[in-house]
């Protein structure tokens, strides 16, 4: 990126949910030229609780060349993507955009599973697809990405395949895209693209994410901490249904296959397997 400081956040990781964005953000933030926002997903340009530009800017280290806002909430609502994109452009017309994509069906299932585990959803996947539009919207990659390409130019939008984040070619493309002066010192560790088969009670979820637990967990061996966590998870044999019915399959094919065809025209890697997988539903 341009080495002249603009005093504006210049890098936005906007999507897609459950496609390795957390891992990628942490990886990018490990580079000494990049400052990752102090809080996860500030969503400042999307009706954030951060009321002023000063409060937003206070979340970054301005001694570094690049400030990174990793907020997948910017692309959660397809109807609002144009507004968010324009808001980013109005804030910084020279911003660079990074967008990770994943097998759309795997992403939907992973997104649904996460929502179920958190207690946000208590219905089957079929019912969730009807009532929670964002499950499908977040897999409409072309419709989302094309807005950013149209606004910022293709040269300022980097599209990455989550399955290939650990590849040397991917890391090289990031270095070139951001015009970094030296390579990264670590690899990308994929975390949030992984799925689990357990559901945690809300009470335990709150405990395991509060500051007290964060402090005391370092007082015990990792084996004990893992044992405690695993014993508070409940296997989700009941309630969680991942099987798609005929209606859901037809909706997914109708909505996502055209997206994949259009997407193939703007990415530099093969996604034909994703398209074929949708056709076989």
What is the meaning of each model-derived region?
Residues 91-110:
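Conserved phosphate-donor/acceptor-positioning beta-strand/loop module used by diverse small-molecule
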């Amino acid at each position: 990126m341009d080495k002249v400081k603009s005093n504006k956040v210049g890098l936005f990781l906007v999507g897609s949910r459950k496609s390795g964005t957390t891992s990628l953000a942490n990886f990018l933030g490990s580079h000494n030229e990049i400052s990752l926002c102090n809080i996860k997903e500030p969503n400042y340009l999307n009706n954030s609780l951060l009321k002023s530009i000063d409060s937003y800017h206070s979340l970054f280290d301005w001694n570094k060349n690049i400030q990174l806002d990793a907020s997948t909430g910017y692309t959660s609502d397809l109807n609002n993507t144009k507004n968010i994109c324009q808001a980013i452009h109005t804030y910084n017309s020279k911003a660079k955009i990074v967008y990770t994509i994943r097998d759309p069906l795997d992403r939907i299932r992973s997104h649904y599973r996460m929502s179920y585990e958190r207690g946000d959803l208590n219905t089957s996947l079929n019912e969730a697809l009807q009532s929670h539009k964002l499950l499908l919207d977040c897999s409409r990659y072309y419709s989302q990405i094309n807005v950013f390409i149209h606004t910022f130019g293709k040269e300022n939008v980097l599209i990455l395949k989550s399955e290939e984040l650990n590849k040397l070619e991917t890391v090289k493309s990031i270095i070139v895209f951001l015009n970094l002066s030296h390579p990264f010192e670590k690899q990308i560790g994929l975390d949030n693209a992984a799925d689990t088969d357990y559901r945690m009670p809300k009470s335990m979820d709150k405990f395991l994410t509060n500051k007290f637990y964060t402090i005391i967990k370092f007082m015990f061996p990792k084996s004990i901490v893992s044992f405690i966590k695993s014993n508070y998870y409940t296997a989700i044999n009941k309630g969680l249904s991942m099987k798609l019915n005929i209606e859901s399959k037809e909706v997914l094919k109708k909505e996502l296959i055209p997206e994949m065809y259009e997407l193939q025209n703007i990415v530099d890697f093969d996604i034909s397997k994703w398209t074929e997988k949708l056709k076989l539903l």
